[in-house]
Amino acid sequence: PPPDRHTLDLDSLAFPDGARTMTNKRCDLPPGSFRAQHKGYEEVHVPALAPPAMDDGEALKKIDDLPEWARPAFKGMATLNRVQSRVCDAALFGTSNLLLCAPTGAGKTNVAMLTILQQVGLHRRPDGSVDGSAFKCVYIAPMKALVAEQTANLAKRLAPYGLTVRELTGDSNLTRAELDAASVVVATPEKWDIVTRRAGGDRA
């Protein structure tokens, strides 16, 4: 049998104030905020949130406390930040999967560096050099511009280990030999999906 039909009164569901609900001029600002009127515009100053207090026993990880071989990747830094310090041991010494959710600017790139160094530590030779052919790390960035930026950043920081970092996007193809020789590949999700689905071939 056909389904029952009902009449829906859309007018009864509309906001009583119409579009004016989207232009509410009232805004409760946090303590310490102020407004200043200028010619042609209004300035609203909202102070930055203070970071929450450190937990008991919580401390920032000093770069000098990292293994000596890991320190060159953090040249110019004195400590890791709070997010990085909390996951440092899991990223640098752990072997389990790691899922990190942190806001923009929280330092996720340095956490990624710690995970790369985990592989560096596993493949150090007795003389201190690194066997870069024994592992491959894939760094996924959402946009081509970020891929180029992170490739340059990682290449500079991993240079002391003799590791090759290559960029892989729709604008930069790699030969199979170049891809095999890279210890770290920085790619967009779309390009890496294409590469991993492709069977064989001389170019990636």
What residue ranges belong to the model's regions?
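Helicase-associated low-complexity/disordered flanking segments
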Residues: 1-89, 95-99, 128-129, 134
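Conserved P-loop/Walker A NTP-binding site and adjacent catalytic elements of P-loop NTPases
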Residues: 75-204
